[in-house]
Amino acid sequence: MQPAKAIAAAPVAMPVPASAPAAAGLPGAVWAELAFFLLFAGFFFYQTLLGLGLIRAYLGGYFAVVSLLLLPPLLLSYVRRLQLRRYQLHRVDAAFLAFLAYFAVVIACNAPSANPAISSHHVLGVLYLFNLFVIFKTLDFQRRRFRLTLLASLAAMSAIVFAFSIDGAFYLAALGAARDPDSVATYQGFSRSYLVPLAVALACTPQRWLRWALYGLGLPTLYINTARSEFGALLFLIPLIEFHAARHKLAMLAVLLALFALLKLNLDAIVAAIPGNRTLELLNLSQSSSASMRHQLTLQALHTIALHPILGDYASYPGGLYAHNILSAWVDLGLFGFAALLVLLLYPMVQMALHAYVLGRRDSRGAAFLLAWSLLGMTALLLCMSHFFSDMLIGAALGAYARYRSGDGHA
């Protein structure tokens, strides 16, 4: 299959002057760092001010407007890097851009007859995927300034969640203080803006004590935010990261299993000690109305796929009522788009697993590997649980993977 062939290996780089990485790295890295904080922490703080009624919705819901404003500098920095490398496109980049191009063609071909709201949503999805890919491929996550700012922003976001939660749940729209309530984000927007920076911080933190402190901060924050999928994703990241970071992996596996058994034995006492909210529905999804709705949407998607197995049936559902999993790609992009997305995600994961756990490659011990490994694993999990095929995390994960495959901190 073409995507698999495209992503298989990095090309042999052309000779580049020694000064080129520095020249290419600084401007792009600065824009990527600015974009990262504007899109995640910036969104969180803007929405907080909006929800508290301290500002009007001057930027609407914020994310789309800011993403559009960031597109020109991110695109220019990406093109500049290609120029410095004599337009030699990395195969990971080529595969991802080919998928985006196919996605864009599908949107354009179906736009005249499709629901405009769905088409607009998908156009923004292409924008978010590209921007996040460039950010995570470009940004230097090891810079001291970046790491300190990241930790400070996580602490500030957690403080906001704890300070404005009511009865164990954080939902600013319920306060009734917003002057433009229709623009206030749901728990999903807040949780995304917290989980992504947290995942970056965890992957790039070598000190185990600091990682566990971040777990201790992140779990209650996402729990109170009532974001079940993101809370589950963090629970998934903990063993994924700690097992990989451990020198003695069998010992760490035993510790993780012991912690799981201890948690299970004391689950009733833990549940009784914490405030109740919808996150607890994870313990019994059969009682969750949201899970029931998602199951029905999945059945609807399977029915559509059975009727249109090759080309799918683009935007054949009411706005927002798409399958909340990777099957949404088959419905909107057809079999080829679905298969391409699977290859884009699964091939890197299989390759990285071989690098780390079979071949024991030295580069699999670095932060670049762990960041890509964490984001790919988390993205795959969320695409199985609740997220749709144009989820921006796909761009972030593949951007981090492209950075790892380049073998250069400023890929």
Residue locations for each model-derived region?
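N-terminal signal-anchor transmembrane segment
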Residues: Q2-R81, Y102-N110, I160-I166, M378, ...
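Hydrophobic transmembrane alpha-helices and their immediate junctions
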Residues: L26, V30, Y87, L335-T379, ...
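Membrane-interface helix-loop-helix junctions at transmembrane boundaries of multi-pass membrane enzymes
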Residues: L26, Y78-A94, A203-A213, A245-A251, ...
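Flexible juxtamembrane loops connecting transmembrane helices in multi-pass membrane enzymes
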Residues: A57, K264-Q296, A315-Y317
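Aromatic-anchored transmembrane helix interface
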Residues: F63-L68, R91-I107, S113-T138, T149, ...
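Hydrophobic alpha-helical membrane-interfacial segments at the cytosolic entry of transmembrane helices
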Residues: A95-A98, L151-A159, R247-D268
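Alpha-helical transmembrane segments of multi-pass inner-membrane proteins
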Residues: Q142-L172, A185-H244, Y347
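TM-adjacent membrane-interface loops and short helices in multi-pass inner/ER membrane proteins
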Residues: S286-A323, L333-A340
